[in-house]
Amino acid sequence: ALMYALEKNLDRVGVRLTYIHQSKDEKLIKNYVFSRAELEEKVASYLESYLAFYAIIMRRIEKRNETAGTLSFPFLNFRKWQRELAKYAYGIAKNGGTLFAEAPTGIGKTISTLYPFVRSFSDGVNEKIFYLTAKNSGKEAALQAVELMKSKGVKLSEVLVTAKDKICFCPGKACNPDECPFAKDYYTKIRDVLTKSLARYDTFDSSRVSRIAAAHHICPFELQLDLSLYVDVIICDYNYLFDPLVYFR
């Protein structure tokens, strides 16, 4: 409305908001009239809130990139073949491409691939790391590797994405405010929840996500998806890349 008022040089603008019921053939129409000054004041307040939020995100990114450049391999020595794997992974992280690697259990594949990608943050080439796995043990190994690198000084944030049926507070109910109380007012609350959570924490596993969601009475599944937009490392099932119904966009 403000953009239209500015474009047409209008002092007042009429706005119509139409709500459509999901399951009934019903509409709720609300009409408003705003002065240009009112619109400017409202938009300025919204922008101020968004800018404060993104200032937190940008400070985290700057600190992440700065500390990633000085991160050493988190163990005193490389195991056999770890150095070679890390070298090839770093080349992919910087230049793109695909690396297929097959190695026995126990060689240290997780840290050998995650470490070079974390280091690449300092070059400004990559914005986010997805770690995909089919097993919960793989998720835990990735989470432990990230925590190990953080203990060595790099400033990272990560979310471990949990399947909806395992984290949902209201299993069996449809994901809409009419059936699930944790969906009600979700988008009214989420900006404040994200701002406080990202300022306070850098690790978001299922237990922490559930505690935050319960404290604010919001959906934990949607919360972890919204957190994934702003963290550095996303650890999740490979379906979130390959399944067209649920994949991250």
Features from the language model and the residues they span:
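Nucleic-acid nuclease catalytic cores
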Residues: A1-L39
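Charged, low-complexity
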Residues: A37-L71
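Conserved pre-motif I regulatory segment
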Residues: R59-E102
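A substrate-engagement module of RecA-like helicase motors
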Residues: N65-A68, S72, V125-I234, N239-F242
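Well-ordered alpha-helical segments embedded in enzymatic catalytic cores
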Residues: W81-Y88, S112-P116, D237-Y240
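Walker A/P-loop NTP-binding motif
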Residues: Y90-G91, T110-V125, Q144-M149
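Walker A/P-loop
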Residues: K94-P116, K128
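Short, conserved "post-DEAD/DEAH" coupling segment immediately C-terminal to helicase motif II
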Residues: V246-F248
